[in-house]
Design a protein with these regions (language model features):
Chain A
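Exposed extracellular interaction/assembly regions and N-terminal maturation sites
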Residues: 20, 24-110, 119, 123-125, ...
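Register-specific beta-strand positions within repetitive beta-rich fiber domains
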Residues: 1-32
């Protein structure tokens, strides 16, 4: 029998999809546009290594400082475990904003490769990180816009 | 009893969501991708007030001219009112393209904040503006990519 981990519900006249377990909103079909639910994580340090859950929150702001820093992605196993139902070929994305005064390089972890390791996020720049699942516990991170 | 401001309809074999009153499309679950309906606003001026209606349309093409320009956000109240059903934590996106010759800087309106006020959109660059509802009357704008 089919099971569901998400539910849809009419709220204030719009169709909202929620996590069935936690009831956290996911996405809403509004009257004009899609509404995407996001949770912001802020990091104040030279280097950042947010958790899989923080990446999945959707926005990471980084007050980079002291010297050139790194943003280390979680392992593929941790990311895969955190996104229930993600199929091979599907993606999740995260907005990353460098609000500090140092250049940041996105750094791989076990099970996640970075498509362009030469690309950096300079101060007051931002990027969209797209994680494409290529196999169980395995992703490629595509780095857009900085 | 639940009421709905959007409706879903099967059209040409794909599932399209429309504004129930105006019948304007919102988004479509296509056979390959999610299709997002967007309306383009063209601005030919040094400065622009980024109105709630422009944000709702989804794409602004700004031919900046004369000198460095300012893109001033509408008020938080107006932006939130433009998206019925928008809840705290929800976000909407607006693509902002500077196809002119001058540098553009975002400026706050009442009830709006900009995460990184130092970030600009230079000539022939573009940004994704992620507008996140923080409270009943306030939003924060995250500028991605310029």
């Amino acid at each position: 029998m089919a099971m569901s981990l998400v539910k849809s519900i009419w709220e204030s006249g719009v169709l909202r999809f929620r996590n069935k377990g936690t009831l956290t909103p996911i996405i809403t079909l509004g009257t004009l546009r899609l509404h995407e639910y996001l949770v912001v994580t802020d990091v104040d340090s030279r280097n950042a290594a947010p958790t899989a859950a923080q990446f999945l929150g959707g926005i990471i702001t980084h007050n980079s400082q002291t010297g050139a820093g790194t943003l280390t992605v979680p392992t593929g196993a941790l990311l895969d475990a955190a996104v229930q139902g993600l199929a091979i070929g599907e993606t999740v994305k995260c907005y990353y904003l460098n609000r500090g005064d140092q250049t940041v390089t996105v750094t791989a972890a076990a099970g996640i490769t970075i498509a362009d390791t030469g690309q950096t996020v300079a101060t007051t720049e931002a990027a969209i990180l797209i994680f494409l699942k290529t196999a169980a516990d395995t992703f490629v991170c595509y780095h857009i816009g900085a | 009893m639940a009421f709905s401001l959007v409706k879903s309809i099967w059209e040409s074999g794909v599932l399209r969501f429309r504004n129930k009153a105006t019948r304007t499309p919102v988004a479509t679950i296509g056979t390959l991708r999610l299709h997002e309906y967007l309306t383009v606003t063209n601005v030919d001026a040094q400065d622009n007030t980024l109105t709630a209606a422009q944000i709702a349309g989804g794409i602004v093409v700004h031919t900046s001219e004369v000198g460095g320009g300012t893109v001033t956000l509408d008020t938080g109240v107006n932006i939130i009112a433009a998206f019925p059903g928008l809840a705290i934590g929800d976000s909407v996106k607006c693509y902002y393209i500077n196809d002119g010759t001058e540098v553009l800087t975002l400026a706050v309106g009442v009830g709006t904040a900009i995460l990184d006020v130092a970030q600009t959109i230079t000539a022939n660059e573009a940004a994704v503006l992620v507008i996140l509802m923080d409270s009943a009357t306030t939003v924060t704008v995250y500028t991605i990519g310029a």
